[in-house]
A protein has these predicted regions:
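Glycan-recognition and catalytic cores of secretory/periplasmic carbohydrate-active enzymes
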Residues: 1-227
Length: 227
């Protein structure tokens, strides 16, 4: 089917791929594609879907967690190609702030998938959505940033959030991590909410073993073995 290029996440993965390909081959052409794609992604951050947004205009304005999460990882993957330390640091700083200080809810111990533009909670299906696998994936991204910056405080925070999220998302009756959850415990919009998907557990095992390697936290190792 012919589909308009509405999804900015295709661009982020392409950017990382071309950056790694440029490093592997030394190709300036691939490096230039990575640089231009990186610039376009940053320019589209405030309105990533542009004219192809499916939401009804003027209703439930939201910002999503997925974008700052993937941008912080992308910045790490392309920094050697971009060769602009100030831009990379600024991009990472902004993304880490959004993840840790805005989307993470300490009183709940989880990261929200969607918030109001001002960072407040929204009481609707999308606004109550929790995706434990997404949260845990983001935490090992933050651990990698902590390694790059020699920032033990950030690593410890990522481990703390990881352990909180995996406890929240774990199915105590049957085992495994739920796909989607509702922060108020209501039924979710997604019919597949209780499926135990492979990628969720893959991201979780990475977060747990990386957390153990970096901090020696035995609880991370116990969860890794359990997974």
């Amino acid at each position: 089917p012919i589909v308009q290029p509405y999804n900015i996440f295709s661009n982020t993965f392409a950017c990382m791929a071309f950056a790694q390909l440029a490093k592997a081959t030394g190709s300036e052409e691939y490096a230039e594609i990575a640089k231009k794609t990186f610039e376009r992604i940053l320019a589209r951050r405030s309105n990533p879907k542009g004219q192809w947004n499916k939401l009804y205009p003027g209703t439930r304005p939201m910002k999503d967690f997925a974008l700052p999460m993937i941008i912080c990882n992308m910045a790490l993957e392309v920094e050697d190609i971009i060769n602009d330390p100030a831009l990379i640091d600024k991009t990472i700083d902004e993304s880490v702030h959004e993840i840790v200080d805005v989307f993470y809810q300490p009183e709940l111990g989880v990261i929200m998938e969607n918030l109001a533009p001002d960072g407040s909670l929204i009481d609707c299906f999308e606004g109550r959505r929790v995706n434990p696998g997404h949260d845990l994936e983001a935490m090992w991204f933050l651990m990698n940033i902590g390694i790059r910056r020699n920032d033990r405080k950030l690593i410890d925070k990522a481990v703390e959030i990881s352990l909180s999220v995996i406890k929240y998302g774990w199915d105590e009756k049957y085992g495994g991590i739920f796909y989607f959850m509702d922060r108020k415990g209501y039924p979710t919009q997604e019919l597949e909410w209780d499926q135990k998907l492979w990628w969720v557990h893959l991201e979780s095992t990475i977060a747990m073993i990386k957390g153990y390697q970096l901090t020696g936290n035995e609880e991370c190792l116990e969860w890794f073995k359990k997974l």
